[in-house]
Amino acid sequence: MPKMKTKSSAKKRFKVTATGKVMAGQAGKRHGMIKRHKKFIRDARGTTTLSAPDAKIVKGFMPYDR
């Protein structure tokens, strides 16, 4: 049976931690930040953990990052 391939788009966007959580960057920061509140901009920094259903989908894209 051939090796399973990792989705290149997923490996660039997500990181699986040692405990199995999937980390991703916050969405909604590409443009239009002038009308956002300062609190939104602060909270949108860094990464966030994905919910369980979303994490299951992303882990399917990356078979060797478990």
UniProtKB/Swiss-Prot annotation:
<dbReference type="GO" id="GO:0006412">
    <property type="term" value="P:translation"/>
</dbReference>
<dbReference type="GO" id="GO:0022625">
    <property type="term" value="C:cytosolic large ribosomal subunit"/>
</dbReference>
<comment type="similarity">
    <text>Belongs to the bacterial ribosomal protein bL35 family.</text>
</comment>
<protein>
    <recommendedName>
        <fullName>Large ribosomal subunit protein bL35</fullName>
    </recommendedName>
</protein>
<dbReference type="InterPro" id="IPR018265">
    <property type="entry name" value="Ribosomal_bL35_CS"/>
</dbReference>
<dbReference type="InterPro" id="IPR037229">
    <property type="entry name" value="Ribosomal_bL35_sf"/>
</dbReference>
<dbReference type="InterPro" id="IPR021137">
    <property type="entry name" value="Ribosomal_bL35-like"/>
</dbReference>
<keyword id="KW-0687">Ribonucleoprotein</keyword>
<dbReference type="Pfam" id="PF01632">
    <property type="entry name" value="Ribosomal_L35p"/>
</dbReference>
<dbReference type="GO" id="GO:0003735">
    <property type="term" value="F:structural constituent of ribosome"/>
</dbReference>
<keyword id="KW-0689">Ribosomal protein</keyword>
<dbReference type="InterPro" id="IPR001706">
    <property type="entry name" value="Ribosomal_bL35"/>
</dbReference>
